Amino acid sequence: MLCALLVLLIAGVSAFLRLSKAGLGCEPWPSCFGEALRALQRGAAVDDNAVQTVALARLAHRLLASTALVLALLLALGHCTAKPLHKGRAALALGLVATALFLAGLGLLTANSRLPAVALGNLLGGFAMLAVSWRLAAPERPGDAAPRAAALWALVACGLVVIQVALGGLVSASHASLSCADSLDCLRQAARQGWPWPTLNPWREPAYDVASALPINPAGALAQALHRVGAIVASLAVLVVAWLLHRQAERRAAATLVLLLSLQLAAG
């Protein structure tokens, strides 16, 4: 449980760093959005550590990530040497260590990268660590397997949530927040552009419309549209899982899912 809470804290600090770098909440808004990226693309030097809050957050992120790696190693050691050996949990613990090492290497090798793929790697890796560490913290309940329909819907919902997380990360890392105003506007712009699927390539550096007075990435409309539509589809799948849990008398789990979904929709 400690590792799961620590990973959740790391995810929060990482999100703060990512959104601060993008310029969300900057002044004067919205003309300041993406100023760091635009300065780098002009060849100017940018030191976001000059902002004390960002510098402290980056230091906290490194300390927390190092602590999480140590905890993951201890978890793996404990599960791999346990008697009797639980192969499933040992494999999960080793996967947790592998993911932590991957994220550590990604951070070292891509510290100044402007590619959305790097942000997606950090985001999805962090969520994977959170899911695995939470699963390791959950108590075993033998003989309490979920019915086939509930298990299938849970798998579908998890897949949709992962896709939704990736699309949200792509919108953020592509500086697409100002690409369109609402769902209909995003769909109209994406249709007007001929549904440009190559713009979803995370290995493309974001580019701004030089003719616009605002820092708008016109290629971000499709990602925005998919993210908004995906939110509806993923929410419906999660609600189906919550309903199935409620029918199985798992009312606490069902209520937790609905609460988390409500908080996410309110935040979005």
For each predicted feature, which ranges?
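Polytopic transmembrane helical bundles with strong interfacial aromatic enrichment
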Residues: 1-268
